[in-house]
From Swiss-Prot:
It holds the Pfam family PFF1_C. This is Vacuolar membrane protease. Zn(2+) 1 binds at residues 207, 219, 279. GO terms for cellular component: vacuolar membrane. It comes from Fusarium vanettenii (strain ATCC MYA-4622 / CBS 123669 / FGSC 9596 / NRRL 45880 / 77-13-4) (Fusarium solani subsp. pisi). Residues 1-11, 448-482, 533-545, 595-708, 767-773 are cytoplasmic. InterPro entries: Fxna-like_M28_dom, M28_fam, Peptidase_M28, PFF1_C, PFF1_TM.
């Protein structure tokens, strides 16, 4: 039995190798995506690290809800303080405690900029500062600012509602002294600030508050316990960092990144040149590198043992595609620091719910974050030179001078390797693909054409100029139009299936994303194979594979134009995967062109074929009888004539059965001439036969049959890895955004588009795949399509998330519960509640969200927020001395609450809280038209707010910072307020502590009676709001 080439371009090998290679790529991708690397045992960890200890700390932190506006928050804060002291004592690390805060960096910056810049940053340094730490217990810093709700971290122009905000922070942070840091309490010296615009230190940040409906195990307890382990590691003997490290445990992140803003008043602000922000936007799983500020920071992350992330996420944040906010925005965009955002990101169904607990996460997840944080922090603390020191790229002198940054591209490979390079390098690569590769292909084409071996787009060849002479058919255009037709057909079916799914059951991706993947991949594979295999069966072509590669190259070239513009003009690196795909397509097409060097020249082939036919005809006539044939007689036909038994091919003359065109009927002259030649010439030798595949062009027999596997290995692995990884991350990031008010179409459509890109590397070879694979996938499509259309989208492990708030309006005497979510499922939740089952529920569009708000009466479940107090007794409001026509001076208090809102009946043009800082322009601009809402926070529940409201646009008593900003933005018009025009102020105070059963009976009822496939989270900062309007 003859041995068959296992890599021949035949249905068996092609079906086997393409399937095996795709499975070998996809299965590890899914495994890496769905699992977390196992944590090492405590004995094998670096000295100073202990995962058992970290897990116990996490259980302690997440034992109860601990939002900023709760008593449990104070318990967690004290626990962190006690644990840091315990760790320092255990490691015999000397430490001191500071209560400094509230540094006015605007005044200090002005001072620094006027100082002599010739000072040597090392003047007061000693050779090596001894080990030590300083604990900063900041109960001083407070922040006042105005901002637009459309751009909470913006500076000037935005659409939305303008608000004022006042926050009193209570951050806690530990400064681990570095070897190169100056001696003493340098943060108390003005000149020391100047020096620390040198090398600087590293800021590592977490927030220890949770939302009011979540225990905060992943968001953000795991980050905080990781930082406790970093403290243990870096304070051991012999582990002192070169540059100092600041471990910041900030508070009230969940309420608007408030703790990070308060750190803007820390004396260590300009000391920290770099940062590592640890966050949790999911519940367990792997910690992804959400984003970095630059290429150099991405290179620092490369030290992580299990890197995970992509620059696509960073671009999505920059362009507003991902709307989640983290402290990264404050550190990078406002303070000007350089660093990274490492965060858990899935599953969002548990995010901000009561399943964000230790039961739904693992030690492995702690280790994944801890190992990345440790590697990045250690590397940041070791870097010297100008990498993170020196003049800034943007030239802003008021921000930390941490060097010039470069834009980068980064991504992981199977969660084990980290690729990082400059964006300019990617742009250069794109330009090379746009310019050099077409020239190379043109050059090869020219050489082939000169050698008469370029069979693409070839026309038929006429051997003689006789008008009656039929040409030799080469079939050079066969297969040219198949790819665009198949791509449009298969792509349309794939997109149509996602659109149909988005119309009837879009949320199925919430719980069954792999069923959606299976549907989109199988329909594209089958429909593309159907067209290509059918076309190949009807009109076989050896140029089929090459033409597909030409089309892929042309499409990729157009996509590279878009990519190059995005990279150069928009500074977007998210299209990096297309560069790898286009490079692979170019190399595969290059091989297809090189294959044609193995062929005969087109005219040589035509001549050889022509001569072979003539010789065969002459040989056959030479064996005829020697009698002289008459013109009207038909010559005898030799037995076994191959022309009678062979089927017609593209090389058979079109008039083969006519006299003089290959038929056995000849003219008398021709017969006499051929017979005479046969009589005097020996029989010609038999031409060597190169058999083409099936009925493809006869010249193609010389083409090598094994080069396809090289092309496939170039085309498939790298693009499939890159697009597959991006698709899986996009799946996890987007699949549960529908219940948050996100688009219901985008998640399923994204999977459809990624499926097409995943299978593009297979398209040049799919016509040789046997029917077994596509028919199996057709069955897969049928099953998954039906399942996706009819299955219920939620389950106990993938719960429908909705938003809750109870509002007690003392003016109207109403007590209502607001349920915000997708209306169909929100109504199902409300119907399950005894108190609301008989009510007529009204739903309307929710403010600020693409969701519906459903209200029901909850007067039978009135909240018990303060023991022995009714809602009417919770808020105190009074006007104090100093109130006049241009200024209102108010005192507000709320029992056992840290938060109240003020909403005025007419615009105000400034506000100030007694004892508070002036407005900070770093956190937002100021509207010329004024604003009507103020949010007030306090750290001490027993101390009321005394607020000054500036009512006149040009009030001389107005805060200077407000007045100056207004003069810059205003139109100069004067607004005169009548003394008898009363100002109405609506006070809304919030309560968020739901740890004690019975405090919020309406929430207790929800948790008890709602379906198991539903999960409740907070609608606003407060679970309960009490409202009352007062006249000033």
């Amino acid at each position: 039995m003859r041995f068959q080439n296992p890599f021949a371009f035949r249905p068996g090998p092609v079906s086997f190798w393409t399937t095996v290679i795709y499975l070998a790529l996809v299965i590890p991708l899914i495994y890496v995506h769905e699992t977390v690397p196992p944590a090492p045992s405590d004995r094998s960890l670096y000295q100073g690290l202990n995962l058992t200890e970290a897990w116990l700390d996490l259980q302690t932190i997440s034992r109860a809800f601990h939002p900023y506006n709760s008593h449990e928050n104070d318990v967690v804060r004290q626990f962190l303080i006690d644990r840091t002291k315990e760790i320092l004592d255990r490691n015999s690390m000397p430490y001191t405690t500071e209560t400094i805060g509230g540094v006015d960096w605007h005044t200090r910056n002005a001072f620094v900029q006027t100082q002599d810049s010739d000072l040597n940053p090392r003047d007061e340094f000693i050779q090596s500062r001894p080990r030590g730490a300083t604990l900063f217990d900041d109960k001083i810093s407070n922040v006042t600012w105005t901002y637009n709700t459309a751009r909470p971290t913006g500076t000037n122009i935005a659409k939305g509602t303008w608000m004022g905000q006042y926050f009193e922070g209570n951050n806690y942070y530990v400064y681990i002294h570095g070897k190169d840091d100056p001696e003493g309490e340098w943060w108390r010296s003005e000149s020391a600030y100047k020096k620390f615009r040198g090398q600087g230190g590293v800021l590592v940040n977490c927030h220890f508050d949770s939302v009011s409906t979540g225990y905060g195990a992943t968001d953000d307890g795991m980050s905080c316990v990781s930082m406790l382990q970093l403290l243990s590691y870096f304070t051991l003997q012999g582990r002192q960092p070169k540059n100092g490290i600041v471990l910041l445990f900030n508070n009230a992140e969940e309420d608007g990144l408030l703790g990070a803003r308060a750190f803007g008043y820390s004396p260590l602000l300009h000391f920290t040149h770099t940062f590592v922000n640890l966050e949790g936007a999911g519940a367990g799983g792997r910690a992804i590198l959400f984003r970095t500020t630059d290429l150099q920071a991405a290179k620092v992350y490369a030290k992580s043992p299990h890197p995970f992330g992509s620059v696509v996420a960073a671009n999505a944040f920059e362009r507003g595609v991902i709307k989640s906010a983290t402290d990264y925005e404050i550190f990078a965009d406002i303070f000007g620091q350089r660093g990274m955002d490492i965060a858990f990101y899935a599953p969002r169904a548990r995010y901000h719910t009561n399943q964000d607990d230790t039961r739904h996460t693992s030690v492995n997840s702690i280790w994944h974050m801890l190992s990345a944080a440790l590697a990045s922090t250690e590397r940041f603390s070791q870097i010297t030179g100008t990498t993170f020191h020196g003049d800034r790229s943007d030239g802003k002198s008021d921000l930390v001078q941490n060097g010039k940054k470069a834009e980068g591209v980064w991504f992981d490979i199977f969660g084990s390797a980290w690729a990082v390079f400059a964006l300019r390098g990617l742009f250069a690569w794109s330009l090379t693909l746009l310019v050099a590769t077409p020239l190379i292909l043109v050059a090869i084409t020219y050489i082939l054409a000169r050698k008469d071996k370029y069979y693409f787009f070839s026309r038929d060849i006429k051997m003689h100029h006789d008008i009656n002479d039929d040409p030799v058919v080469l079939g050079g255009w066969k297969g040219f139009l198949r790819f665009p037709f198949a791509l449009v057909f298969a792509g349309a079916l794939t997109i149509a299936s996602t659109l149909l799914l988005a119309k009837f059951n879009p949320l199925i991706i919430y719980s069954s994303p792999y069923a959606v993947w299976s549907m989109t991949l199988s329909i594209f594979y089958f429909s593309f194979w159907l067209i290509m295999r059918g076309a190949s069966f009807i009109r076989p072509s050896a140029l089929h594979r090459g033409y597909v590669l030409i089309w892929l190259f042309a499409l990729g070239w157009g996509l590279q134009v878009v990519g190059a513009v995005a990279e150069d003009r928009l500074h977007i690196a998210a299209l990096y995967a297309t560069v790898f795909l286009q490079s692979a397509v170019f190399l595969a097409l290059f091989i297809s062109l090189l294959e044609q060097f193995a062929l005969l020249g087109k005219h040589d082939f035509a001549m050889q074929l022509h001569d072979a036919h003539q010789a065969r005809d002459i040989s056959s006539h030479g064996t005829d009888h020697e009698s002289r044939p008459q013109p009207e007689e038909e010559p005898a036909q030799p037995e076994g004539d191959e022309d009678e038994s062979e089927d017609a091919t593209e090389t058979t003359p079109l008039r083969a059965n006519e006299p003089g065109y290959g038929s056995s009927t000849r003219t008398s002259f021709a017969a006499t001439y051929r017979r005479s030649v046969a009589d005097n010439a020996p029989s010609p030798p038999r031409m060597r036969r190169y058999q083409p595949y099936e009925h493809e062009q006869s010249w193609s027999g010389r083409l090598p049959s094994w080069t396809w596997i090289i092309q496939f290995l170039l085309l498939a692995p790298v693009p499939v890895i890159l697009f597959g990884n991006l698709g899986l991350v996009a799946m996890s990031a987007l699949q549960m955004t529908g219940t948050d008010g996100g688009s219901l179409l985008v998640p399923v459509l994204t999977l459809g588009i990624v499926s097409i890109f995943l299978l593009l590397p297979l398209t040049p070879f799919i016509h040789r795949v046997s029917h077994h694979v596509p028919m199996f996938l057709l069955c897969v499509f049928a099953g998954t399509f039906i399942y996706n259309l009819v299955a219920f989208p939620f389950s106990d492990s993938h719960r429908f998330k909705f938003y809750f708030q109870q509002v007690v309006d003392l003016d109207n005497g109403t007590d209502t519960v607001s349920i915000v979510g997708l209306e169909r499922f929100s109504r199902s939740v409300i119907k399950s509640l005894p108190s609301a089952s008989s009510q007529d529920i009204k739903c309307e569009k929710a403010v600020g969200r693409d969701l519906m708000e459903c209200l029901y009466d909850s007067s039978s479940l009135s909240p018990h927020l303060v023991e022995g107090k009714t809602p009417r007794e919770l808020i105190t409001f009074e006007t104090v001395d100093g109130t006049n026509a241009s200024k209102g001076r108010l005192r507000i208090d709320a029992l056992d609450s840290r938060l109240c809102y003020l909403h005025t009946s007419r615009p105000i043009y400034g506000f100030a809280v007694d004892g508070g800082a002036a407005r900070d322009p770093r956190f937002g601009g100021f509207p010329s038209e004024g604003f009507k809402t103020i949010q007030l926070w306090r750290r001490d529940r027993d101390r009321p707010w005394t607020v000054n409201l500036y009512l006149d646009e040009h009030s001389q008593q107005a805060d200077k910072s407000f007045e100056g900003e207004h003069k810059k933005l205003g139109d100069g018009s004067v607004v005169h307020r009548r003394a008898d025009d009363p100002l109405e102020v609506t006070v809304r105070c919030a309560w968020s502590d739901a740890n004690k059963p019975g405090t919020i009976p309406a929430l207790d009822e929800l948790l008890k009676y709602m379906p198991t496939w539903a999960a409740v989270t907070k609608k606003n900062v407060g679970l309960v709001e009490v409202r009352k309007t007062y006249k000033v």
